[in-house]
């Protein structure tokens, strides 16, 4: 017996009339009123039915870590995992700081380090080295690393590009060029430590960072739509140009006997760290991170998308401008204390995002701890690899950050970033 043929009725339902040829149901026309709603409903059901592992993030058009389906970013694991990650980073940072206090051109036994820190030892060369030379350097490295890492995490959200950081966007190079100009106009490049104790060097660095950011934005907008990829490319170009200009200023205006010291600082170094150079970076870090933590939710909205953030009430243009100014201020103060240290703001946020997910309320503290740990370890290597000669710490971060940058590009290739 032959099966009954079914025909489609007006509403797309089969009539079940026997002997009639089977006619497939036609999909609704795209221009009918119900088509968009139906498509959105199907997309919503598909996104809701698709299981997603905690912390799993996708890459948007610009590579920004956002959840599939346009939902806000999810935390990687629960509170226990977050606590374990923070505790582990604190322990690792304490161990790295202890090793940095003990190791160097002069090796100090751990017991002597502990006695110097607790005040149980009297005046001695070991106590002077620990308290007056190495401890300020370790603390400054932790502060600068934390500041650059937090700024890097924020910039990656602002431009929605995983390759963004203060160095690659030209902010660090602009701050360095502004600081070098202050040094040259201030009467010589040998006053790095002294000038840092005033507001002149950070102010010059801040102006240089802002001007660099404006220049990068202007170049990225030239000849087309502003996208995150064009922004990063313009930032890399401006970074190299400003670094060359800063070096030229040092060569032309610097006295030969002071040129090496200034070049060491411009390449990124913590050799000028003293107790009086630590207060301003530490204060700016505390205020800056506290302010950015209050902006965690708007930063999360930017990861979802420009249109979605606007619909939810965020003035994205004004928000970006304000956060860019804050990020430039933090970067300028860090650069004025340590020189241009690259790639810490690129590597630490990615490691933190893998550990605790994309929400910025959890990401920023972990990125700060990761950046502090990275720079303390890099400075330890800089002081011990070729002891008693110090290697500029920026050289070591570039040696590790460059391959990481290439790996990141190879790991997640994608089209040009979304329009900003």
Model-derived features: where do they sit?
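Alpha-helical transmembrane segments in inner-membrane proteins
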Residues: 2-17, 21-34, 42-45, 50-420
